């Protein structure tokens, strides 16, 4: 049952399509930066060659393409 409570979950880990035009999968959504960073690092390992980003709302914090 919904309690009507709102959560602030600003950190997102997303996998993008090969043309970087849209999100294919929301991998993680959390309010904790350390959890988001760990999810990002694991997603990059499990999805070699794919575009994975870590964002805080609209701010880009990490991109798998910059790790090469």
Show which residues each predicted segment covers.
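A short, charged, amphipathic alpha-helix used as a generic interaction element across diverse proteins
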Residues: 30-49
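Local beta-strand/beta-hairpin segments that build beta-sheet-rich folds
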Residues: 24-28, 61-63
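Short linear motifs at secondary-structure transitions and domain/linker junctions
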Residues: 2-5, 26-31, 38
């Amino acid at each position: 049952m919904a309690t009507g409570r709102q959560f602030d979950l600003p950190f997102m880990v997303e996998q993008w399509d090969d043309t970087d035009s849209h999100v294919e999968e929301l991998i993680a959504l959390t309010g904790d930066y350390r959890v988001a960073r760990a999810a990002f690092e694991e997603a990059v390992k499990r999805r070699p060659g794919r575009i994975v980003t870590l964002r805080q709302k609209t701010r880009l914090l990490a991109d798998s393409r910059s790790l090469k």
